[in-house]
A protein has these predicted regions:
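Extended catalytic-interface subdomain
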Residues: 251-253
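RNA-binding accessory domains that recognize and position tRNA/RNA substrates
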Residues: 2-247, 262-439
Length: 439
């Protein structure tokens, strides 16, 4: 919840539907703020939320989670808010989406009518208002104290840094940890943009050998994530202890992080890797101004803040970096092959204009070799897998249909320029069933 928010809000009550974010985004697309809350919220809790104009109950016809039937509390219908049912037929609801079947246009029209005609909500949710509100809230929370931020250079942390810089200026201290799992030229670019262009207080730490040493021989994806996350915290802790007067920690949590990390009616998809787990004697109050934004809204926020296009639309990059794209136990030769293949892919996508139309694209190197032929001799080298997906909110994703000549040029370059690779494949798996990342 955005504290003291001034915008009208539609509340989505979660009955275990996997389409909660779809409904939430449909409302936000109308310029009205929406939030997902658990099905067992009380009428008192609901009324305590700011500027609620209506409720959408979202769930399937059976409403069963882990074998237990669930429903909203009866008092919700008497709380004084208009109620719409999505995904099933509720007798006490003013509007029922079930009557429209799979007619998407009719469903959108019904949601629009419910939001504006029934709930009388005002379309005042936009990034200009969001930035103004958050700058005010950050200043109220932080005052004249200092904020520490782990700056990866990705979209989320970059937008967060820009927002914090706007709110508190020189009281923001950024730490960039190069764990050796960055893309080619990534750390150098972070230093150039944030230290030299945005004039942020930036501390750069090269911890490549520390991370790769700890990851040697570790094949399990979740264990790799935990090692990377744990060591990151230790490095971050070391740098934090060198600074005096830090009271707050900036964290780039966004809404999909919250949704995918598990709620009362949702399962954990994978461990997320924002900063956490600092020791008890080094605890900070969190500053998380982006936590209610979907990914496209984070980008829109970056545009509103005046960040460069290449920064706002930088490719999404996981916290563990190439560590979850170098499958299995990480080795330096595969990591280098992966880094070079990724650079080639990004260069060719930019040349073809695909960097402006494809949401995320990257390469993966698995931990097995394939038989091939190089210089008229048998070779036994690594394959490279290309993945390119489009999505709005990272909750679902479709495969980008890349033109054959572009794929062939990428393949030719990878095979010619990386001597340890002899095969290139294209991943055709959407989300679901596959996640966007391989690990």
């Amino acid at each position: 919840m955005i504290e003291n928010m001034k915008q009208d809000m539609i509340v989505i009550l979660d009955l275990g539907s996997h389409e909660n974010t779809v409904v939430a985004r449909a409302v936000r697309a109308l310029g009205v703020y929406s939030e997902i809350h658990p099905h067992d919220i009380t009428a008192e809790e609901l009324k305590a939320l700011p500027n609620v104009k209506g409720i959408i109950i979202n769930g399937g016809p059976n409403n069963v989670v882990d074998g237990v039937a669930i429903d909203v509390l009866p008092e919700i219908y008497e709380a004084g808010f208009p109620v719409m049912a999505a995904g099933h037929d509720k007798a006490l609801c003013e509007v029922k989406l079930a009557q429209f079947g799979n007619d998407e246009e009719a469903i959108k029209a019904a949601i629009k009518s419910f939001v504006f005609d029934t709930c009388k909500a005002e379309a005042n949710w936009n990034m200009k208002n969001f930035v103004a509100d958050q700058v005010e809230l950050i200043r109220q929370q932080v005052g004249d104290k200092k904020v520490l931020l782990a700056l990866s250079g990705g979209v989320d942390s970059s937008v967060l840094a820009a927002l914090l810089l706007k709110a508190i200026g020189d009281n923001l201290y950024c730490v960039h940890v190069n764990h050796g799992l960055m893309r080619k030229g990534e750390s150098e670019n972070v230093v150039e943009v944030f230290r030299n262009q945005l004039c942020a207080n930036l501390i750069y730490v090269d911890a490549t050998d520390r991370f790769l040493g700890l990851l040697e021989g570790v094949a399990d994806p979740e264990q790799k994530r935990k090692i990377i996350g744990g060591e990151f915290i230790r490095v971050f802790e070391e740098e934090a202890r060198k600074l005096d007067g830090i009271d707050f920690l900036g964290q780039g949590t966004i809404y999909p992080d919250i949704a995918e990390s598990g709620t009362k009616t949702a399962k954990v998809v994978k461990s997320h890797h924002n900063v956490g787990g600092l020791p008890e004697d080094l605890q900070f109050e969190l500053v998380e101004p982006l936590k209610q934004l979907f990914k496209d809204e984070v980008r829109a926020c970056g545009v509103e803040l005046g960040l460069p296009h290449e920064m706002v639309y930088r490719q999404p990059f996981p916290g563990p970096g190439l560590g979850v794209r170098c499958l299995g136990a990480i080795t330096r030769d595969r990591l280098e092959a992966l880094r070079e293949a990724d650079a080639i892919l990004r260069e060719e996508f930019a040349a073809a204009g695909l960097d402006k139309t494809v949401w995320q694209y990257f390469t993966v190197v698995p931990d097995f070799k394939s038989v091939g032929v190089r210089n008229n001799e048998r070779s036994y080298d690594w394959p490279v897998i290309i993945r390119a997906v489009n999505t709005i909110d990272a909750m679902t994703a479709t495969i980008e249909q890349i033109e054959w000549p572009v794929l062939m040029k990428i393949t030719d370059r990878i095979l010619a320029e990386i001597p340890t690779v002899n095969r290139v494949c294209y991943d055709l798996s959407p989300k679901p069933n596959a996640t966007i990342e391989w690990e």
